[in-house]
From Swiss-Prot:
Signal sequence interval, chain numbering: none
Name the record gives this protein: Developmental pluripotency-associated 5 protein
SUPFAM superfamilies recorded: Eukaryotic type KH-domain (KH-domain type I) (SSF54791)
Species in which this protein is naturally found: Homo sapiens
Gene Ontology cellular component list: cytoplasm
Family: Belongs to the KHDC1 family.
PANTHER family xref list: DEVELOPMENT PLURPOTENCY-ASSOCIATED PROTEIN 1/5 FAMILY MEMBER (PTHR31368), DEVELOPMENTAL PLURIPOTENCY-ASSOCIATED 5 PROTEIN (PTHR31368:SF4)
GO biological process: regulation of gene expression
UniProtKB keywords: Cytoplasm, Developmental protein, RNA-binding
Lineage of producing organism: Eukaryota, Metazoa, Chordata, Craniata, Vertebrata
Function of the molecule: Involved in the maintenance of embryonic stem (ES) cell pluripotency. Dispensable for self-renewal of pluripotent ES cells and establishment of germ cells. Associates with specific target mRNAs.
Top-rank lineage group of the source organism: Eukaryota
Residue intervals of the KH domain: 23-84
Length: 116
């Protein structure tokens, strides 16, 4: 997805400093980020506004995972984490189904492994 610009401001619905303590953290496969957050993270401001949370993405070195950090009040953090994990799982399953259909189509055409 590329490098996201550094955050310049904290959204007005995030209370400083109490909402910045003890964030919810989880990891998402980097290849799913564009599907969840849009090209170059264009959907992040909308997701933050609707969920009343603040998101921060951190690429993990030597891994195909990205760490998602969710700041906000306790319930908003948990709800946002659950929503994003559900979206990631949905997109992962969707991509997996697409790969299975592609494999079936290639088998139906009897393409050899050198064509894959």
């Amino acid at each position: 997805m590329g490098t996201l610009p550094a955050r310049r401001h904290i959204p007005p619905w995030v209370k400083v400093p109490e909402d910045l303590k003890d964030p919810e953290v989880f990891q998402v496969q980097t290849r799913l980020l564009k599907a969840i957050f849009g090209p170059d993270g264009s959907r992040i401001p909308y997701i933050e506004q609707v969920s009343k949370a603040m998101l921060e993405l951190k690429a993990l070195e030597s891994s195909d995972l990205t760490e998602v950090v969710v700041y906000g009040s306790y319930l908003y953090k948990l709800r946002t984490k659950w929503m994003l994990q559900s979206m990631a799982e949905w997109h992962r399953q969707r991509q997996e189904r697409g790969m299975l259909k592609l494999a079936e189509a290639m088998n139906a055409l009897e393409l050899g492994p050198w064509m894959k």
